[in-house]
C-alpha cells in the first residue's frame, strides 16, 4: 500500500497543478501533435546528417594533407639504384674529346626503389601521434608496409586471441547497428581487407598509381564508417608507390554518436518543456470548456426556477470568451423564454377559466330555469361564453405559433406605403357601417420628397400590426366625429408609422400595461369579452421580431388636456434611393 501511495503522489500533484485536463482527449491531442512536430524535427536533423557529412569532409582534407606530407617524406628517403649501368658502344664512338663516358640518363630512366628499412622508421615516426592507419603499396599495388605491423626495437607484442565461444551481440548492440545503418546512405561500399596484401581492390589506390589522389568512404559490416585517402609517392615525375591512409573503424561514428546524444539530450529537455507548456495550454482550454459543458448539463437538467449560472470568461478576449458570452446570452434567453411560456400558460389558464366558469354556471342553472325568458337569457350567456372561448383559443393559438412562424419564414421587401394604403381602404369598407369613423392616410415626405418606405420583413404580420392598431383605435373613438389618422414618415434609418385617434387617451399608469397579455381596458358600453387582450401584445411581439419597436403615448391638446392616443411603430428602413 505504501508503494501504491508513493506512486500516486505524482499523479495527484499533476491533477492539482493542471486539473483533470491532463487526462482529457484534448490534452492528449495537444501533447501528441506538439511532440510529433518535435520528433519530426529531431529525426530530420539526424537523418540529414549534415554534421557527419561535414566531419567526413574535414577528415578527408586532413588525411590528404597528412598523406602529402608523409608521401613527401617517403619519396625523399628513396635513393637511386646505381648497382648496374649499361654502356652503349656505338654511343661511346660518338663521344667528342673531353666528354664523360658516364651515361647521363633522364629522370624517367632512373629508378627510385622504396627501401622498407629506410621508410619504416619514417612512417612509424609520422603515424604514431595519430590513430590513422597507413599502408604503403609499391608500383605494382603490392603491400610493402602496414602501420599495424610496425614495431620499434624491444617492443613486446601481445595478440588477443578470439574467444572460444563468441557471445552473440546484445539487443542494444543490434539496435545500435540497425540505427546506424538506417541513418547512413545506402550506397556506401562495404569495406574489405585486400586478399594477399594487394591493393588493386581499392579504386583509389589504382587511381593514385596514375598520379591522381583520391578518397573513398566505406562502411563495415557493423555499420561503422572508414574514410580512406590514397596519395601517390612520387620522386620527380616517377610514381614510386601509393600511400593509403585510413581512419579507424568507428572513429567518426563515435564523434557522430556523441553529437547525437547531445541532440537527444536537448530533445529530452525540449520535450519536457513542450509537455509542460502543452499541459498549461490545454488547462487554459480544456478546463474552461469542461466548466462550460458541466454548466450546460446543469441547465439541461434544471428548471426555470433555479437558474444555473454559466461561467463568465469574457475577460479572456478569445474564442472561449466569446463562447462563454454566447452561452450566457443563450441561457438567459432560454430562461426568459421558459419563464414567458410558464407565465403564458398561467395567463391562458386564468383567461380560459373565467368563461368556462361562467359557462358551467349557466349550464348548471339552465335545468332550473322556470320560464322561457330565463332559459333564453341563459342560452345567450352560453353562446356568448362559447364565442369568447373561441376568440381566446384563436388568439392564443396565433400568439403561441408566432415565434416559430417568424423564425421559419423568409423576410422579403415590404412597401409600407402601398401596404398601409390597402389596409386603410379595406378598413373603411368593412367597418364603415358599424361606427362612422373618418379614417385618413397621410404620407409625410417633407424632409425627402423621393424617400422610399421599403422595409425587410413579413408583409402579413406587419399588416396584422396595423390592423390591430386601427381596430383598437376604432373601439375608443367617440360615436360622433370619430377620427383616425394613419401617418407614414421616415427618418434616416427607420420608417415610422403613427396611428392617432381622438378618443379618451390612455391612463398614465396603463401606457405600458396595455401591451401585457390578456390586459383589457375597454370603453364603456362595449360588451365584456369582445376582446382577448392579446392584440397589442402580439403586435409588439411582431414589431420586436422585425427589429422594431411599438409604443403608446397620449396626444396633448392646445389646452394641455389629453385629446387622444397615438401608437408609434418604428421599423428598420432600407437605404434612401
Swiss-Prot record:
UniProtKB keywords: ATP-binding, Cell inner membrane, Cell membrane, Exopolysaccharide synthesis, Kinase, Membrane, Nucleotide-binding, Phosphoprotein, Transferase, Transmembrane, Transmembrane helix, Two-component regulatory system
Phosphohistidine: residues carrying this PTM: 350
InterPro entries: HAMP_dom, HATPase_C_sf, His_kinase_dom, HisK_dim/P_dom, HisK_dim/P_sf, Sensor_TM1, Sig_transdc_His_kin-like_C, Stimulus_sens_dom
Documented EC number(s): 2.7.13.3
Domain of life: Bacteria
Organism: Rhizobium meliloti (strain 1021) (Ensifer meliloti)
Subunit and interaction comment: Homodimer.
Classification via SUPFAM superfamilies: ATPase domain of HSP90 chaperone/DNA topoisomerase II/histidine kinase, Homodimeric domain of signal transducing histidine kinase
Listed name of the protein: Sensor protein ChvG
Signal sequence interval, chain numbering: none
Pathway connected to this protein: Glycan metabolism; exopolysaccharide biosynthesis
